[in-house]
Protein backbone atom coordinates (compact mmCIF):
# COMPACT_ATOMS: atom_id res chain seq x y z
CA UNK A 1 0.00 0.00 0.00
CA UNK A 2 1.45 3.36 -1.06
CA UNK A 3 0.76 6.02 1.57
CA UNK A 4 0.98 9.81 1.44
CA UNK A 5 1.23 12.08 4.44
CA UNK A 6 -0.93 15.15 3.79
CA UNK A 7 0.03 18.04 6.08
CA UNK A 8 -2.67 20.69 6.39
CA UNK A 9 -0.78 23.98 6.79
CA UNK A 10 -3.09 26.54 5.17
CA UNK A 11 -4.78 27.88 8.32
CA UNK A 12 -4.16 31.24 9.94
CA UNK A 13 -4.07 30.17 13.63
CA UNK A 14 -5.12 33.56 15.01
CA UNK A 15 -6.01 32.28 18.50
CA UNK A 16 -2.36 31.42 19.13
CA UNK A 17 -1.30 35.06 18.73
CA UNK A 18 2.25 35.91 17.67
CA UNK A 19 1.40 37.82 14.48
CA UNK A 20 2.14 34.96 12.05
CA UNK A 21 0.29 31.70 11.34
CA UNK A 22 1.11 29.32 14.18
CA UNK A 23 2.71 26.71 11.92
CA UNK A 24 5.40 29.28 11.09
CA UNK A 25 6.12 30.38 14.64
CA UNK A 26 9.41 29.38 16.22
CA UNK A 27 9.45 26.54 18.72
CA UNK A 28 12.73 25.44 20.27
CA UNK A 29 14.76 27.01 17.46
CA UNK A 30 12.75 25.59 14.54
CA UNK A 31 9.47 26.48 12.86
CA UNK A 32 6.49 24.49 14.14
CA UNK A 33 5.99 23.09 10.63
CA UNK A 34 9.64 22.02 10.55
CA UNK A 35 9.14 20.03 13.76
CA UNK A 36 6.05 18.39 12.27
CA UNK A 37 7.81 17.48 9.05
CA UNK A 38 10.82 16.08 10.90
CA UNK A 39 8.47 13.56 12.54
CA UNK A 40 7.49 12.31 9.08
CA UNK A 41 10.47 12.72 6.77
CA UNK A 42 12.49 9.89 8.31
CA UNK A 43 9.64 7.37 8.04
CA UNK A 44 10.00 5.08 5.03
CA UNK A 45 6.30 4.16 5.25
CA UNK A 46 5.44 7.39 3.41
CA UNK A 47 5.84 7.35 -0.36
CA UNK A 48 5.08 11.06 -0.55
CA UNK A 49 4.67 14.02 1.80
CA UNK A 50 2.24 16.67 0.55
CA UNK A 51 1.97 20.03 2.30
CA UNK A 52 -1.22 22.05 1.75
CA UNK A 53 -0.39 25.74 2.11
CA UNK A 54 -1.94 29.18 1.86
CA UNK A 55 -0.60 30.89 -1.30
CA UNK A 56 0.03 34.00 0.80
CA UNK A 57 2.60 32.06 2.84
CA UNK A 58 5.15 31.54 0.06
CA UNK A 59 7.92 33.28 2.01
CA UNK A 60 7.20 31.21 5.11
CA UNK A 61 7.29 27.96 3.13
CA UNK A 62 10.58 29.00 1.53
CA UNK A 63 12.02 29.55 5.00
CA UNK A 64 10.92 26.07 6.11
CA UNK A 65 12.45 24.55 2.97
CA UNK A 66 15.69 26.39 3.69
CA UNK A 67 15.66 25.17 7.29
CA UNK A 68 15.25 21.55 6.16
CA UNK A 69 17.32 22.01 2.98
CA UNK A 70 14.68 20.20 0.90
CA UNK A 71 12.07 21.08 -1.71
CA UNK A 72 8.57 20.37 -0.42
CA UNK A 73 5.66 19.09 -2.51
CA UNK A 74 3.16 21.89 -1.85
CA UNK A 75 -0.37 22.47 -3.11
CA UNK A 76 -2.51 25.59 -2.56
CA UNK A 77 -5.29 25.20 -0.03
CA UNK A 78 -8.81 26.59 0.00
CA UNK A 79 -10.96 28.87 2.11
CA UNK A 80 -11.83 26.09 4.59
CA UNK A 81 -10.02 23.11 6.05
CA UNK A 82 -12.32 20.84 4.06
CA UNK A 83 -11.35 22.56 0.81
CA UNK A 84 -7.65 22.42 1.71
CA UNK A 85 -7.76 18.71 2.49
CA UNK A 86 -9.60 18.06 -0.77
CA UNK A 87 -6.71 19.73 -2.63
CA UNK A 88 -4.22 17.49 -0.85
CA UNK A 89 -6.26 14.38 -1.65
CA UNK A 90 -6.41 15.28 -5.33
CA UNK A 91 -2.63 15.62 -5.35
CA UNK A 92 -2.30 12.17 -3.73
CA UNK A 93 -4.66 10.74 -6.36
CA UNK A 94 -2.60 12.27 -9.16
CA UNK A 95 0.50 10.63 -7.69
CA UNK A 96 -1.17 7.22 -7.82
CA UNK A 97 -1.20 6.63 -4.06
CA UNK A 98 -3.50 4.22 -2.24
CA UNK A 99 -3.91 5.75 1.20
CA UNK A 100 -3.37 8.99 3.10
CA UNK A 101 -2.59 10.14 6.61
CA UNK A 102 -3.96 13.64 7.08
CA UNK A 103 -2.17 15.57 9.81
CA UNK A 104 -2.47 19.04 11.31
CA UNK A 105 0.67 21.13 10.82
CA UNK A 106 0.21 22.41 14.38
CA UNK A 107 0.70 18.97 15.98
CA UNK A 108 4.51 18.83 16.12
CA UNK A 109 4.85 15.95 18.61
CA UNK A 110 3.57 13.01 16.56
CA UNK A 111 5.21 9.80 17.74
CA UNK A 112 6.51 6.86 15.71
CA UNK A 113 4.39 4.39 17.68
CA UNK A 114 1.18 6.20 16.68
CA UNK A 115 2.16 6.12 13.01
CA UNK A 116 2.82 2.39 13.34
CA UNK A 117 -0.61 1.79 14.93
CA UNK A 118 -2.34 3.64 12.11
CA UNK A 119 -0.46 1.77 9.38
CA UNK A 120 -1.32 -1.55 10.99
CA UNK A 121 -5.00 -0.62 11.35
CA UNK A 122 -5.21 0.50 7.70
CA UNK A 123 -4.67 -3.10 6.67
CA UNK A 124 -8.08 -3.99 8.14
CA UNK A 125 -10.04 -0.72 8.07
CA UNK A 126 -10.59 1.88 5.31
CA UNK A 127 -10.75 4.68 7.88
CA UNK A 128 -8.98 4.92 11.23
CA UNK A 129 -8.21 7.79 13.59
CA UNK A 130 -6.34 8.20 16.88
CA UNK A 131 -8.43 9.21 19.87
CA UNK A 132 -8.07 9.71 23.60
CA UNK A 133 -10.80 9.00 26.16
CA UNK A 134 -12.09 12.22 27.74
CA UNK A 135 -10.63 12.39 31.25
CA UNK A 136 -12.05 15.64 32.65
CA UNK A 137 -15.44 16.00 34.26
CA UNK A 138 -17.99 17.42 31.80
CA UNK A 139 -21.08 19.53 32.35
CA UNK A 140 -23.30 21.91 30.46
CA UNK A 141 -23.12 25.57 31.34
CA UNK A 142 -24.19 29.07 30.46
CA UNK A 143 -24.29 32.58 31.92
CA UNK A 144 -21.26 31.69 34.07
CA UNK A 145 -23.24 28.95 35.81
CA UNK A 146 -22.71 25.22 35.96
CA UNK A 147 -25.48 23.13 34.46
CA UNK A 148 -26.17 19.41 34.30
CA UNK A 149 -23.24 16.98 34.27
CA UNK A 150 -22.51 15.02 31.11
CA UNK A 151 -21.30 11.44 31.33
CA UNK A 152 -17.79 10.81 29.98
CA UNK A 153 -18.66 7.24 29.08
CA UNK A 154 -17.96 6.64 25.41
CA UNK A 155 -16.60 10.15 24.81
CA UNK A 156 -13.30 10.57 22.98
CA UNK A 157 -11.16 13.45 21.75
CA UNK A 158 -10.06 13.00 18.13
CA UNK A 159 -6.48 13.61 17.02
CA UNK A 160 -4.53 13.53 13.78
CA UNK A 161 -3.09 12.00 11.68
CA UNK A 162 -6.31 10.46 10.44
CA UNK A 163 -5.69 7.59 8.04
CA UNK A 164 -7.84 6.48 5.10
CA UNK A 165 -7.89 4.41 1.98
CA UNK A 166 -7.84 7.14 -0.64
CA UNK A 167 -10.59 5.99 -3.04
CA UNK A 168 -13.48 5.88 -0.51
CA UNK A 169 -12.35 9.16 1.05
CA UNK A 170 -12.40 10.89 -2.34
CA UNK A 171 -15.91 9.54 -2.94
CA UNK A 172 -17.01 10.86 0.45
CA UNK A 173 -15.60 14.29 -0.35
CA UNK A 174 -17.38 14.27 -3.73
CA UNK A 175 -20.69 13.66 -1.96
CA UNK A 176 -19.95 16.39 0.56
CA UNK A 177 -19.98 19.27 -1.91
CA UNK A 178 -19.10 22.60 -0.33
CA UNK A 179 -20.18 21.66 3.20
CA UNK A 180 -17.45 22.28 5.80
CA UNK A 181 -16.96 19.61 8.45
CA UNK A 182 -14.53 19.65 11.40
CA UNK A 183 -12.32 16.78 10.27
CA UNK A 184 -11.96 13.98 7.75
CA UNK A 185 -13.49 11.32 9.96
CA UNK A 186 -16.66 13.43 9.96
CA UNK A 187 -16.60 13.40 6.15
CA UNK A 188 -16.54 9.59 6.12
CA UNK A 189 -19.30 9.43 8.73
CA UNK A 190 -21.44 11.87 6.73
CA UNK A 191 -21.12 9.52 3.75
CA UNK A 192 -22.30 6.58 5.85
CA UNK A 193 -18.89 5.03 6.46
CA UNK A 194 -17.42 3.64 9.65
CA UNK A 195 -14.28 4.88 11.36
CA UNK A 196 -12.05 2.67 13.51
CA UNK A 197 -10.18 4.00 16.55
CA UNK A 198 -6.63 3.45 17.75
CA UNK A 199 -5.17 4.88 20.98
CA UNK A 200 -3.88 8.41 20.56
CA UNK A 201 -1.04 10.09 22.44
CA UNK A 202 -1.36 12.79 25.08
CA UNK A 203 1.86 14.36 23.77
CA UNK A 204 0.30 14.73 20.32
CA UNK A 205 -1.64 17.86 21.25
CA UNK A 206 -2.58 20.66 18.89
CA UNK A 207 -1.13 24.15 19.26
CA UNK A 208 -4.11 26.47 19.42
CA UNK A 209 -3.57 29.02 22.21
CA UNK A 210 -0.66 30.82 23.85
CA UNK A 211 -0.88 28.33 26.70
CA UNK A 212 -0.39 25.50 24.20
CA UNK A 213 2.81 27.12 22.96
CA UNK A 214 4.06 27.49 26.52
CA UNK A 215 3.38 23.78 27.08
CA UNK A 216 5.10 22.96 23.79
CA UNK A 217 8.23 24.91 24.77
CA UNK A 218 8.41 22.88 27.98
CA UNK A 219 7.98 19.66 26.03
CA UNK A 220 10.65 20.64 23.52
CA UNK A 221 13.06 21.34 26.38
CA UNK A 222 12.36 17.91 27.87
CA UNK A 223 12.99 16.26 24.49
CA UNK A 224 16.13 18.26 23.60
CA UNK A 225 19.64 17.10 24.38
CA UNK A 226 22.99 18.78 23.85
CA UNK A 227 25.41 16.76 21.73
CA UNK A 228 28.99 17.27 20.63
CA UNK A 229 30.91 16.15 17.58
CA UNK A 230 34.64 15.99 17.02
CA UNK A 231 36.64 15.96 13.81
CA UNK A 232 40.31 15.71 12.93
CA UNK A 233 42.10 15.97 9.61
CA UNK A 234 45.65 16.10 8.29
CA UNK A 235 47.04 17.08 4.89
CA UNK A 236 50.56 17.23 3.53
CA UNK A 237 52.16 20.60 2.76
CA UNK A 238 53.98 21.24 -0.49
CA UNK A 239 55.08 24.35 -2.40
CA UNK A 240 52.08 25.76 -4.27
CA UNK A 241 50.49 29.04 -5.27
CA UNK A 242 47.25 28.63 -3.30
CA UNK A 243 46.08 26.99 -0.08
CA UNK A 244 42.43 26.70 0.97
CA UNK A 245 41.93 26.70 4.73
CA UNK A 246 38.63 27.18 6.57
CA UNK A 247 37.11 28.30 3.30
CA UNK A 248 39.65 31.08 2.76
CA UNK A 249 42.20 31.36 -0.04
CA UNK A 250 45.74 31.84 1.30
CA UNK A 251 48.73 32.71 -0.89
CA UNK A 252 51.85 31.91 1.13
CA UNK A 253 53.83 29.72 -1.26
CA UNK A 254 52.34 26.56 0.25
CA UNK A 255 49.42 24.30 -0.55
CA UNK A 256 47.66 21.37 1.08
CA UNK A 257 47.66 18.18 -0.96
CA UNK A 258 44.57 15.99 -1.20
CA UNK A 259 41.88 14.55 -3.45
CA UNK A 260 39.57 17.56 -3.03
CA UNK A 261 40.76 21.09 -2.29
CA UNK A 262 42.37 19.58 0.87
CA UNK A 263 40.86 22.19 3.20
CA UNK A 264 41.81 20.49 6.47
CA UNK A 265 39.85 23.00 8.56
CA UNK A 266 36.56 22.42 6.77
CA UNK A 267 37.20 18.66 6.62
CA UNK A 268 37.63 18.50 10.38
CA UNK A 269 34.54 20.65 10.86
CA UNK A 270 32.54 18.44 8.48
CA UNK A 271 33.49 15.34 10.47
CA UNK A 272 32.51 17.08 13.70
CA UNK A 273 29.06 17.97 12.34
CA UNK A 274 28.59 14.44 11.02
CA UNK A 275 29.54 13.16 14.45
CA UNK A 276 26.90 15.32 16.13
CA UNK A 277 24.34 13.96 13.66
CA UNK A 278 25.47 10.36 14.20
CA UNK A 279 26.11 10.18 10.46
CA UNK A 280 29.54 8.60 10.13
CA UNK A 281 32.48 10.45 8.64
CA UNK A 282 33.43 12.44 5.58
CA UNK A 283 35.00 9.44 3.84
CA UNK A 284 31.68 7.58 3.85
CA UNK A 285 29.86 10.43 2.14
CA UNK A 286 32.65 11.69 -0.14
CA UNK A 287 35.10 8.82 -0.70
CA UNK A 288 38.49 9.86 -2.13
CA UNK A 289 38.17 6.98 -4.59
CA UNK A 290 35.28 8.79 -6.31
CA UNK A 291 36.60 10.96 -9.17
CA UNK A 292 33.69 13.42 -8.93
CA UNK A 293 35.22 14.86 -5.74
CA UNK A 294 38.66 15.47 -7.25
CA UNK A 295 39.49 19.12 -6.67
CA UNK A 296 36.04 19.76 -5.15
CA UNK A 297 35.50 22.72 -2.86
CA UNK A 298 35.04 21.54 0.71
CA UNK A 299 32.13 23.95 1.21
CA UNK A 300 29.88 21.29 -0.32
CA UNK A 301 31.00 18.67 2.20
CA UNK A 302 30.20 20.91 5.15
CA UNK A 303 26.82 21.99 3.79
CA UNK A 304 25.88 18.34 3.26
CA UNK A 305 26.79 17.51 6.86
CA UNK A 306 24.69 20.42 8.14
CA UNK A 307 21.77 19.21 6.03
CA UNK A 308 22.02 15.75 7.62
CA UNK A 309 22.13 17.31 11.09
CA UNK A 310 18.95 19.28 10.37
CA UNK A 311 17.21 16.18 9.04
CA UNK A 312 17.63 14.43 12.39
CA UNK A 313 16.28 17.45 14.28
CA UNK A 314 19.65 18.99 15.10
CA UNK A 315 20.67 22.62 15.29
CA UNK A 316 24.30 23.71 15.32
CA UNK A 317 25.01 26.19 18.13
CA UNK A 318 28.83 26.49 18.31
CA UNK A 319 31.93 25.56 16.32
CA UNK A 320 35.56 25.61 17.49
CA UNK A 321 38.43 24.85 15.08
CA UNK A 322 42.08 24.52 16.08
CA UNK A 323 44.71 24.63 13.32
CA UNK A 324 48.05 22.98 14.14
CA UNK A 325 50.99 24.06 11.98
CA UNK A 326 54.27 25.96 11.95
CA UNK A 327 53.24 27.66 8.73
CA UNK A 328 51.45 29.44 7.24
CA UNK A 329 50.78 31.98 9.95
CA UNK A 330 47.09 31.88 10.80
CA UNK A 331 46.77 35.26 12.53
CA UNK A 332 46.46 37.41 9.39
CA UNK A 333 43.64 35.20 8.09
CA UNK A 334 41.79 34.42 11.32
CA UNK A 335 39.00 36.98 10.94
CA UNK A 336 38.31 35.99 7.33
CA UNK A 337 38.19 32.31 8.34
CA UNK A 338 35.81 33.04 11.18
CA UNK A 339 33.52 35.03 8.90
CA UNK A 340 33.53 32.33 6.22
CA UNK A 341 32.78 29.50 8.65
CA UNK A 342 29.97 31.58 10.16
CA UNK A 343 28.56 32.15 6.68
CA UNK A 344 28.65 28.45 5.79
CA UNK A 345 27.19 27.20 9.06
CA UNK A 346 24.63 29.96 9.56
CA UNK A 347 26.10 30.68 12.99
CA UNK A 348 26.76 34.19 14.27
CA UNK A 349 30.48 34.94 14.28
CA UNK A 350 30.53 35.08 18.08
CA UNK A 351 29.70 31.34 18.07
CA UNK A 352 32.63 30.45 15.82
CA UNK A 353 36.19 30.23 17.12
CA UNK A 354 39.37 29.81 15.09
CA UNK A 355 42.46 28.96 17.14
CA UNK A 356 46.01 28.19 16.07
CA UNK A 357 48.88 26.43 17.76
CA UNK A 358 52.15 24.65 17.01
CA UNK A 359 53.79 21.49 18.27
CA UNK A 360 56.98 23.30 19.25
CA UNK A 361 58.89 21.94 16.24
CA UNK A 362 57.94 18.36 17.13
CA UNK A 363 56.45 15.81 14.75
CA UNK A 364 55.36 16.21 11.14
CA UNK A 365 53.69 19.57 11.77
CA UNK A 366 56.77 20.80 13.62
CA UNK A 367 58.94 19.83 10.67
CA UNK A 368 56.60 21.70 8.32
CA UNK A 369 55.59 18.54 6.48
CA UNK A 370 51.87 18.95 7.04
CA UNK A 371 48.99 20.76 8.72
CA UNK A 372 46.48 19.27 11.15
CA UNK A 373 43.06 20.56 12.14
CA UNK A 374 40.78 19.64 15.00
CA UNK A 375 37.15 20.74 15.29
CA UNK A 376 34.56 20.41 18.02
CA UNK A 377 30.93 21.41 17.56
CA UNK A 378 28.02 21.70 19.94
CA UNK A 379 24.48 21.09 18.72
CA UNK A 380 20.97 20.80 20.12
CA UNK A 381 19.16 17.64 19.10
CA UNK A 382 15.44 16.96 19.49
CA UNK A 383 15.07 13.32 20.48
Swiss-Prot record:
Bifunctional enzyme that catalyzes the formation of 4-diphosphocytidyl-2-C-methyl-D-erythritol from CTP and 2-C-methyl-D-erythritol 4-phosphate (MEP) (IspD), and catalyzes the conversion of 4-diphosphocytidyl-2-C-methyl-D-erythritol 2-phosphate (CDP-ME2P) to 2-C-methyl-D-erythritol 2,4-cyclodiphosphate (ME-CPP) with a corresponding release of cytidine 5-monophosphate (CMP) (IspF). The keyword Nuclease does not apply. Its EC number is 2.7.7.60, 4.6.1.12. 4-CDP-2-C-methyl-D-erythritol 2-phosphate binds at residues 233-235, 259-260, 281-283, 357-360, 364, 367. GO terms for biological process: isopentenyl diphosphate biosynthetic process, methylerythritol 4-phosphate pathway; terpenoid biosynthetic process. This is Bifunctional enzyme IspD/IspF. It comes from Maricaulis maris (strain MCS10). In the N-terminal section; belongs to the IspD/TarI cytidylyltransferase family. IspD subfamily. CDD domains: CDP-ME_synthetase (cd02516), MECDP_synthase (cd00554). It comes from the Bacteria.
Amino acid sequence: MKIAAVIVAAGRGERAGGGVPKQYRRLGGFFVLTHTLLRLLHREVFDSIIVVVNPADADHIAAVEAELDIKLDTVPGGATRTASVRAGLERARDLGLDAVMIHDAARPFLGDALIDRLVKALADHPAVIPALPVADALFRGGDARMGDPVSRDGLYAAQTPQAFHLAPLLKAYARLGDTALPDDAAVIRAAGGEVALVPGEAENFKLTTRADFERAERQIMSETITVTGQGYDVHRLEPADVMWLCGVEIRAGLGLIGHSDADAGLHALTDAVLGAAGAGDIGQHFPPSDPQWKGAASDAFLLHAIKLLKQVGGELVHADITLIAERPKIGPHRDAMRARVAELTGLPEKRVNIAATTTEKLGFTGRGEGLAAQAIVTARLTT
